[in-house]
Amino acid sequence: MDRNADINLLVIKAFTKLKASLYYEKNNLHLRQQMVDFCSEEIEQKLINLANRLSNGDSFDDELKKIGLFLLPKKIKSTQSDPNILSNSFDFNKNEIERLMIYAVIPIELHIVAVLWVMLFGSKLDKELDQYCWGNRLIIDEDTEEIKAGRHLFKPYFKQYQQWWSKAIDEANHLLENKENVCILNLDIQNYYHSIRIKPDDLKNKDGDWNDSEKMVWQLFLKIHQNTMRCYAILVFVKTTLRTALHCLSDCYRPHYWPIVI
């Protein structure tokens, strides 16, 4: 990423990459609706205003205050008498939510800033990852060692997953051919994205040479992260009460979302 590029151009590129990522998003329909609303009118002026605010070091307190959580049922425990009978007529209150899907509700302007942060600093962090780290890897140009131009930021996850799995099977077959014993363990870290804690010092600009726009993007990105994690912390604190409330709600089962802004 050209650090000397005009901030207006960088914002447009970040917005384009954000839109491209949402094209493949199948779960977070709320975010897709946010993008539709954002693009409904005066989109060019909105991007210009965002670039000017970043360049001038303006406050984003109003947007930061709007950060919250968006909850959907992930796993439902049914108490129906006969699980082999499928019907569209049953009592919602006889079902219990066992697990939740938790999404962050963040204004589109801040999503653009987050993408801009990845564009400016992501390649430096990606270099530090082991070659066997497969998820959420950036598309890096081998010659420039920077993020490639284009609409996309990350390598498609399903392709990375297939490659990881195929290599594991190939290695297992190789060991078997050499008369070695093989045991394949497939482990999954439960609630990883809800549990991981990142220290600000782990996300430093490795160059240590910051221009004003980079400083603004960096500081704002930290605030986005901190405000989002604060919402998660509050949710964890009240989870017992929340589960009780969810058990009493039937509307959340229907095709509507239930946003919670903390």
Regions inferred by a protein language model and the residue ranges of each:
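Short linear interaction motifs
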Residues: 81, 85, 89-102, 162-176
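Active-site-proximal segment of RNA-dependent polymerases
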Residues: 118-186, 191-197
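Generic detection of long, well-ordered alpha-helical segments
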Residues: 33-44, 107, 111-114, 151, ...
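Non-catalytic, polymerase-adjacent accessory regions of viral genome-replication enzymes
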Residues: 1-93, 97
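Short, flexible loop/turn elements at secondary-structure junctions
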Residues: 74-76, 108-110, 188-193
